Amino acid sequence: MKLWKRAAAAIKDRKSLLAVGFSRRNSSYRNADLEAAIIKATSHDDSSVDYSNAHRVYKWIRSSPLNLKTLVYAISSRVNHTRSWIVALKSLMLLHGVLCCKVPSVVGEFRRLPFDLSDFSDGHSCLSKTWGFNVFVRTYFAFLHHYSSFLSDQIHRLRGNNRRSLEKTSDSVIQELERIQKLQSLLDMILQIRPVADNMKKTLILEAMDCLVIESINIYGRICGAVMKVLPLAGKSEAATVLKIVNKTTSQGEDLIVYFEFCKGFGVSNAREIPQFVRIPEEEVEAIEKMIDTVQEKPKLEKDEEKEDEKAMVVLEQPKKLQTIITDKWEIFEDDYRCFDRKDKWEIFEDEYHQNHLPLITMNQPVYITYTMPDLITF
């Protein structure tokens, strides 16, 4: 960024901070300190990320869900009035961190992002220089838009399930399969977020890719964990869907390796080492395929049995009733296939990656507001 552009960008940020300072009124949706932290965390500077103010925003959000109104108001105003890809991308990264706060009262309210960047276009440079950044912002927005909706739906679904005393196992399996398919769609979206132009090797892009690499590991881990849990519970009616999900998971594992290799070549720090991804055993896949074949063969067997049953049917006439005696024939299907010890492998793999804190998204730190109580007892 040229010197005069940096100066103009700094002036814009300063004006925004002054505007917040002049309107220092704390109402139900205004918090001047939080708004100032949001402006600083989404500044026009593409050479660095203000980690301290980003984490300050997260602390405000986790300390009280009431601050969500201020966040929505401030960040939507910020994004709707900007034509800078830098501000737009930093705003997306900031909201990504908010979604990772894991505060149900906050995440549950984010059914959609408070702004629309689906057709974003930078207005400060010519299109030949900014088209790659525009694509990056749009694809990142598309992922977060669906991710926020997914997380919100999960929160509300869990609340609904907790209100029910009993739930059918078949219904829970179907819900879990639908959840896995949504996670797979989200992972596909992440794999589309990457630099596509030659002039995009900038600090801010590298920071965003660091976040996305860790998020891809997180989502893929949730997919694998959910698949391993649902395999022993799935019946013959869900076998075809399960096989489709398993094949998709295997394919995404290969795509994720390619994504890591690209990120490593681009210089993303969290992709310096390509992990050994957990694969679903061939025995599991063969068991599902066998179950599907059994279901497909069953109609033929039933037709043959009907013909044999007609021959084996004996009608005994009695004075006031007819009694039908049918030969007993039972077919046993083995649904409960054993799964290998999957939990330990994945937890070790996931823990190794989560030891590297996300550059802008560090959520697993408890936040407390400490108040010093006056000593009113000492004489």
Curated annotation (Swiss-Prot):
Membrane keyword on record: yes
UniProt domain ENTH: residue ranges: 26-158
Places the protein is found: Membrane, Clathrin-coated pit; Golgi apparatus; Cytoplasmic vesicle, Clathrin-coated vesicle
CDD domains, sorted: ANTH_N_AP180_plant
Pfam families reported for this sequence: ANTH
PROSITE patterns for this protein: ENTH (PS50942)
GO MF, one example: clathrin binding
Highest taxon listed in the record's lineage: Eukaryota
GO biological process terms on file: clathrin coat assembly; clathrin-dependent endocytosis; defense response to fungus; vesicle-mediated transport
Membrane listed as a keyword: yes
Annotated keywords: Coated pit, Cytoplasmic vesicle, Endocytosis, Golgi apparatus, Membrane
Listed GO CC annotations: clathrin-coated pit; clathrin-coated vesicle; Golgi apparatus
Name this protein carries in UniProt: Putative clathrin assembly protein At1g68110
Taxonomic source organism: Arabidopsis thaliana
